[in-house]
Amino acid sequence: MVRDQIARRGITNPRVLAAMTTVPRHVFVPSARQDEAYADRPLPIGAGQTISQPYMVAYMADVAGVEPGMCVMEIGAGCGYQAAVLAAMGAEVFALEIVHELAEQALPLLSSFELANLHYHEADGSKGWPDAAPYDAIIFSCAAPSVPDAVFEQLAVGGRLIAPVNADSGDHQTIHRWHKTAGGTLHQEKLISVRFVPMTGAIEE
């Protein structure tokens, strides 16, 4: 999977590739989908949600510039696969998931990995996780019409925020990357077109 689906598509960061090799995707995939666990596509995990395709998990970690020792927040953590990969890269990870059914499944699974640097919490990601801020990187694993101000405020100076943005309510989105400068200014760039499940919670109001 790592060689054929990720490295050959341009992800060469050794930390990303090592983490993708270390974290077994099949344990996050429902039993009925085990034969597809290492296919490069998203798979349903219940509650209308999906586990992201392996390439996209690697891509998000790569463009966020995640390095060991960084403080990273993930919003829309779902089953916990992306969070586990980020933790395997050596980051201190704070993962948020609003769907109770998914959080209930993810918590014992992630505990079995015994990753002291991975913290998973059931909560509305639109408010972020202010107690652990600021974050060197913030990754949205769900699509939002815009990034809440409360989340931007939790991004550290020099940090990067990666989010699929769906401004027109269509099925497809564009991943945007913001970088916060020393003066607190946010520089934005558009990266690639994607398709993520929509963010829920206060962002819908």
Where in the sequence are the language-model features?
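Conserved nucleotide-cofactor-binding alpha/beta core module
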Residues: 65-187
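Class I SAM-dependent transferase core
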Residues: 1-73, 81-85, 89, 102-112, ...
